[in-house]
UniProtKB/Swiss-Prot annotation:
UniProt keyword Transcription present: no
Purpose: Together with movement protein P17, plays an essential role in virus long distance movement.
Keyword Membrane: yes
Subunit (UniProt): Homodimer. Heterodimer with movement protein P17.
Name by which UniProt lists this protein: Movement protein P3a
UniProt keyword annotations, A-Z: Host cell junction, Host Golgi apparatus, Host membrane, Host mitochondrion, Host mitochondrion outer membrane, Membrane, Transmembrane, Transmembrane helix
GO cellular component, one term: membrane
Regions crossing the membrane: 9-29
Location of this chain's protein in the cell: Host cell junction, Host plasmodesma; Host Golgi apparatus; Host chloroplast envelope; Host mitochondrion outer membrane
UniProt note: domains: The C-terminus regulates the targeting to host mitochondria.
Family as reported in the entry's similarity comment: Belongs to the polerovirus movement protein P3a family.
Amino acid sequence: MDYKFLAGFALGFSSAIPFSVAGLYFVYLKISSHVRSIVNEYGRG
């Protein structure tokens, strides 16, 4: 077992988690704002 490779993989994986969470959060914000605009359109009509 190559511990350096394993440690590097764990470090890369743990450092990639915040980026993926931030990406999901931005996607969620875009979708929710889009849905809100659609709901507002129907609410006015």
